[in-house]
């Protein structure tokens, strides 16, 4: 009989934790800011905040003044389509997770997802204890681990069909076979965090007016193993 050749995807953490979903201008999310009519002076003051945690501090100031973040769109149409292919609500879910990661005191993806799940911005029916948000985030992580990248149209094809190898910093090798997908999903879900990339390089983290004079703010998505 024919024995299929199994392909494995490999991530090495030797020399530092590797990224799972890489930042770029293509991974920016745009929000409109409502709830408060910001003056030019306020906008300038917020944009000039230059602390070591300036993105978080700018967001805190926007919220202090009554500003509300309303997700508008992901900046890159291809990346947004890839997200929608995984789940039609994934862009909005990740947008909520992004805002939360810059508001609370954790960057841990599992903790952030659980927090957003508690707030339930999509009003899912939680009567039966179904984990809507966690399931969708896990699907995103699996897709990212197996070949989905931001600016390349993706059709749900996984680049590895056998499993996923993780080379840990101490040289140990973890092997996840796809026939135990839940174990693999949980590994990704429990071992990833969001990371703030360079705001000047990728053009996010400042208040600005769009072409219709609406006040906007961009946040950037990057996921790294922790």
Predicted regions and their residues:
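Short, positively charged
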Residues: 1-226
């Amino acid at each position: 009989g024919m024995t299929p050749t199994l392909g494995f995807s490999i991530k090495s953490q030797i020399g530092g934790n590797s990224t799972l979903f890489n930042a770029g201008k293509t991974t920016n999310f745009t929000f409109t800011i409502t709830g408060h009519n910001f003056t030019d002076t306020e906008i300038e003051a917020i944009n000039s905040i230059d602390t070591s945690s300036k993105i978080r501090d700018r967001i805190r100031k926007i919220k202090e003044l009554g500003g509300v973040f309303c997700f508008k769109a992901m900046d890159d149409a291809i990346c947004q389509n890839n997200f929608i292919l995984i789940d039609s609500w994934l862009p909005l879910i990740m947008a909520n997770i992004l805002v939360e990661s810059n508001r609370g005191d954790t960057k841990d993806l599992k903790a952030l997802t659980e927090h957003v799940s508690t707030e339930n911005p999509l009003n899912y029916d939680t009567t039966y204890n179904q984990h809507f948000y966690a399931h969708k985030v896990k699907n995103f992580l699996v897709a990212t681990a197996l070949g989905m990248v931001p600016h390349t149209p993706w059709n749900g094809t996984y680049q590895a069909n056998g499993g996923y190898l993780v080379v840990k910093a101490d040289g140990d090798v973890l092997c996840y076979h796809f026939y135990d997908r839940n174990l693999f999903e949980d590994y990704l879900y429990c071992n990833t965090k969001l990371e703030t990339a360079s705001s000047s390089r990728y053009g996010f983290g400042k208040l600005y007016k769009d072409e219709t004079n609406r006040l906007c703010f961009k946040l950037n998505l990057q996921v790294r193993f922790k």
